[in-house]
Amino acid sequence: MIIKNLQAFSRLLILNSPLIAIDYGSKKLGIALSNQERSIAMPLNTITEINKKIVITSLLSIVEKYKVCGVVIGMPIDMSGAVTEQTNMVMKFAEEFTKSINLPIYLQDERLTTKAANNFLKSFGMKRKDRDNNDDAVAASMILETVLDSMKNI
């Protein structure tokens, strides 16, 4: 189920169980995982498959492996706050994913996270190809970190 309010989302979470975050794109998606205490977000991996059934199967495997209690999906909204084609694509994916999983899903504004992740990796001297292979997972960790920080204030 998609939860639009962070406070309501946090009330549905199981204690000592991690969250995952997804930075969903048309060519790949980044995955991040929190620790069980939900105090730290870490990049986990990047899925380069674009077939939605395979993507969902991969995500369900991650959810099961790490005993995840909730999902955060980055919502790409343009700088003015308007809905874009990418926003609609992510919303459609989120709605499809809810049919396969019985966990709360929270949609988090992800403006500029991929760019910030790319700049972060660049600051370590990472080459463009390597940055492109890792920026979505780092962006997912930034999205998740935003949610974790916000949940501390609830």
From Swiss-Prot:
Chief site of localization: cytoplasm
SMART domains, per the entry: YqgFc
Coiled coil location: none
Molecular-function GO term, any one: nuclease activity
SUPFAM superfamilies: Ribonuclease H-like
Keywords in alphabetical order: Cytoplasm, Hydrolase, Nuclease, Ribosome biogenesis
Keyword Oxidoreductase part of the UniProt annotation: no
Keyword Transferase: no
Domain of life per record: Bacteria
First-tier enzyme category under EC: hydrolase
GO cellular component, one term: cytosol
Pfam family, one: RuvX
Compartments, record wording: Cytoplasm
UniProt-listed Enzyme Commission number(s): 3.1.-.-
NCBIfam families: RNAse_H_YqgF (TIGR00250)
Family to which this protein belongs: Belongs to the YqgF nuclease family.
PANTHER family assigned to the protein according to its UniProt record, in alphabetical order: POLYNUCLEOTIDYL TRANSFERASE, RIBONUCLEASE H-LIKE SUPERFAMILY PROTEIN (PTHR33317:SF4)
Protein function: Could be a nuclease involved in processing of the 5'-end of pre-16S rRNA.
Official protein name in the record: Putative pre-16S rRNA nuclease
